[in-house]
Amino acid sequence: GSEMCIRDRSSLVQLIPRLYDAESGTVRVGGVDVRDYNLDVLRREVSMVLQKNVLFSGTILDNLRWGDANATEEECIRMAKLACADEFIQCFPDKYNTWIEQGGSNVSGGQKQRLTIARALLRKPKVLILDDSTSAVDTATDAKIRKAFREEIPGTTKIIIAQRISSVQDADRILVLENGQINGLGTHAELLATNAIYQEVYNSQTQGGGDFDKQGGAQ
C-alpha cells in the first residue's frame, strides 16, 4: 500500500509487468521475482496507465469495461469518481452512454487520461503504475485524484512518474534517478534538504509564484 515515485526514464517501470526483462539483477513484486510469476497473473496484478493511452469507438461504459468486462455500471461510476472523470461525464447529455470516437478524438487530453485511469482501476490491481498519466490534467484535479487514491485505495501500491513535483511530493518515497543511477531516495522534505538535483527541479518549478503546471520536471 505504499507509494514510490520515480522521476526519470519510464523504461524502469516497464520491467515490473515484464514488457521486457532485466539483463541483470531482479525485480520483485510481493517479494517474488517477476520472472517466477505466470505472465497473465502478473499483468492482471499490475496496471500501467501511460501518458498517451488508447480509447476505442464505443460508449464511455464500453471503454471503461476494457478494464473489467464484467464490471457493473455502479463499479464503473465509482472508479470514474476516483479518477475525477465522473464530474465531466455528468456534463454530457448521454452521460456514461456518451459515444467516444476512435482514439478519443472527441474528448480532451485530460478527459482521456482520466478515463484511462478509471479503466485501469477497474482491474483492481495490486500495483498501479502512472506513467506521466496526469500530464494533461490541471494541478487542482491532479491533487484531487491523488487524494482519492490515498483515501479510497490505500492497499494498492502506486508508482508515479511525473513531470511536476506537485504530482509526487506527498508520496511515501521519491526516487531520483540520474543517468540510470539512483541519485536520491526519500520523502519530499528529505530530498529538499539533501538532494541537489531535486532542489534544482523544485526551484525551477516554483519560480514566479509556484506555478507547477507551466514547467516540466527532470527527464
Where are these regions (language model features)?
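ABC ATPase nucleotide-binding domain helical subdomain, centered on the C-loop/LSGGQ "ABC signature"
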Residues: 26-31, 36, 43, 61-102, ...
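ABC-fold ATPase nucleotide-binding domain signature/coupling loops
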Residues: 22, 28-30, 86-115, 130-133, ...
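Conserved catalytic motifs of ABC-family nucleotide-binding domains
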Residues: 53-71, 89, 107, 128, ...
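C-terminal portion of ABC ATPase nucleotide-binding domains
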Residues: 82, 91-95, 132, 140, ...
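Short, small-residue-biased leader/transition segments that mark boundaries at the very start
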Residues: 1-6, 57, 161
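Helix-to-loop junction immediately C-terminal to a conserved catalytic motif
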Residues: 16-17
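ABC nucleotide-binding domain "signature motif"
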Residues: 23-33, 173-174, 182
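A short, proline-enriched helix->beta-strand linker immediately N-terminal to the Walker B motif
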Residues: 122-126, 155
